[in-house]
Design a protein with these regions (language model features):
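N-terminal accessory/pre-domain segments preceding catalytic cores
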Residues: 1-26
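Short basic, glycine-rich beta-strand/loop surfaces that mediate nucleic-acid
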Residues: 2-6, 74-84, 97-147
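N-terminal intrinsically disordered, cationic/polar leader segments
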Residues: 14, 50-54, 58-59, 77-82
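Glycine- and Gly-Pro-enriched alpha-helical subdomains that act as flexible
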Residues: 19-62
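A generic structural motif
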Residues: 35-39, 85, 130
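Conserved active-site and cofactor/substrate-binding residues in soluble primary-metabolism enzymes
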Residues: 43, 47, 84-87, 134
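Active-site pocket-lining segment
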Residues: 59-79
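Short amphipathic alpha-helices within nucleic acid-binding modules
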Residues: 87-96
Length: 147
């Protein structure tokens, strides 16, 4: 048996699911990581946290209505993906900019985890969204899901 406050959280989440009708357009957020950096699981999690948060903060300014809708449907879906290298990550960043989709490059600094993290600034990830799945599919289809 769950405590009443926890049950209330589950019930509230269930009520937001009623918004998912046939006309519903899926809103997602994405974190795309550089596969060539071989980040540890802990490092990936930290960079993903930065990616989702910074993209969301940018979206609050760029697209407040969509961001509010994302928040109102239980914070939507978050998807983590790999880009092969920095070039692929920059391509996604530029494509999002061109389409006015909120995005933010994540730049790690001051951490030393050799060989890639030497203490100098390094681009590790890209945060995107919230964005409608159908408006961003032409960008995200190039990347692979994290396993």
């Amino acid at each position: 048996m769950l405590d009443a406050d926890i049950q209330a959280m589950l019930d509230q989440r269930k009520s937001t699911m009623s918004a998912f009708t046939a006309e519903h357009r899926a809103l997602n957020m994405y974190a795309i990581f550089r596969a060539d950096l071989d980040m540890t699981p802990g490092k990936l999690c930290a960079q993903g946290g930065h990616a989702f948060l910074q993209a969301y903060e940018k979206a609050l300014i760029q697209r407040p209505e969509i961001t509010s809708h994302y928040k109102g449907t239980g914070n939507g879906t978050k998807i983590s993906m790999y880009a092969k290298n920095l070039g692929q990550l920059i391509r996604a960043y530029r494509d999002c900019q061109k389409d006015s989709i909120p995005c933010e490059l994540i730049i790690d600094r001051s951490h030393i985890i050799l060989p890639h993290f030497t203490g100098n600034p390094i681009i590790t990830a890209l945060g995107i969204g919230p964005a409608y799945k159908d408006e961003i599919a032409h960008i995200t289809r190039r990347y692979t899901l994290l396993k």
